[in-house]
Design a protein with these regions (language model features):
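Pyridoxal 5′-phosphate
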Residues: 1-137
Length: 137
C-alpha cells in the first residue's frame, strides 16, 4: 500500500529511500496536484475575485467550487465556513486574532501544552498580552 502511494509523489523517483517529516513546513506534492497547478499557471492563471474578464471569472468560479468541495468533504454546514490560508501559521494567527477580538474577555485563560510548536505559541502569547490580566497556561 505504501509503495502504491509513494508512486503518486514524483520526489520518490529520485529519492527512493526518502523519509519526509517536514510536512508542516512544506508538504510533498502528488503528481495530479503538480499537473493541475502547472495547467492552471500555463493556460488559465488570473487574479481571483479581481476581474470581470473570462480568465478571472473562470478561475474565481473554480476557486469557489473548491470551497464547496472542501465543505462537503468535512461535512461543514456551509461553504461559507471554509477559509483558505496560505499556511497553518497564517491560519492560527487569524483564529487567535478573531477569537481575541470577538470572544475573549479580560481575565480569560488560554490553555496550551508544553508540546506546542512555536508558531502556535506566539499568537496566543500576543492574545494574553492584549487582554488585560489574561493568562497563558
Amino acid at each position: 500500500m505504501i509503495e502504491n502511494l509513494k508512486k503518486r509523489f514524483p520526489v520518490f523517483e529520485k529519492n527512493k529511500n526518502l523519509v519526509f517529516f517536514d510536512t508542516a513546513a512544506s508538504a510533498l506534492k502528488v503528481d495530479s496536484m503538480i499537473k493541475a497547478v502547472n495547467e492552471c499557471y500555463s493556460y488559465e492563471y488570473a487574479n481571483i475575485h479581481r476581474g470581470i474578464y473570462e480568465l478571472s471569472s473562470n478561475l474565481t468560479k473554480r476557486y469557489e467550487d473548491s470551497r464547496l468541495t472542501v465543505s462537503k468533504f468535512i461535512n461543514s454546514s456551509s461553504f461559507e465556513n471554509i477559509i483558505f490560508t496560505k499556511s497553518a501559521t497564517e491560519g492560527i494567527n487569524l483564529v487567535s486574532s478573531c477569537l481575541s477580538d470577538n470572544y475573549f474577555n479580560d481575565g480569560d485563560e488560554v490553555l496550551l501544552t508544553s508540546l506546542e510548536h512555536h508558531a502556535n505559541l506566539i499568537p496566543w502569547h500576543l492574545v494574553s498580552k492584549k487582554l488585560k490580566s489574561s493568562q497563558l497556561k
